[in-house]
């Protein structure tokens, strides 16, 4: 009986720490915890209470951080 009470106490106190870990992981990737992801979002992690951590998918194409190859003299390979 003492073993059961000990295990119950350990699991009871570890549960909030585990849930905080999942929420922290989601905020690190700039996600949001929600019941379901939108069309332009992808599931990247799990949050507490069976919620999903969703992050907006970046659209394909040129981004501000990538430099254009125009004028660089680099010829891309085709095929």
Curated annotation (Swiss-Prot):
Keyword Disulfide bond: yes
Protein family membership: Belongs to the beta-defensin family.
S-S bonds: 26-53, 33-47, 37-54
Annotated source species: Mus musculus
Keywords from the UniProt entry: Antibiotic, Antimicrobial, Defensin, Disulfide bond, Secreted, Signal
Highest taxon above the source species: Eukaryota
Major subcellular site: secreted
Name the UniProt record assigns to this protein: Beta-defensin 15
GO CC aspect terms: extracellular region
Cell compartments where the protein resides: Secreted
GO biological process: defense response to bacterium; innate immune response
């Amino acid at each position: 009986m003492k073993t059961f009470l000990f295990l119950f106490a350990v699991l009871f106190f570890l549960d909030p720490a585990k849930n905080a870990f999942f929420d922290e992981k989601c905020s690190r990737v700039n996600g949001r915890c929600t019941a379901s992801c939108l069309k332009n979002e992808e599931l990247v992690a799990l949050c507490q209470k069976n919620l999903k951590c969703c992050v907006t998918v970046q659209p394909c194409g040129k981004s501000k951080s990538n430099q254009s190859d125009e004028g660089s003299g680099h010829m891309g390979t085709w095929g």
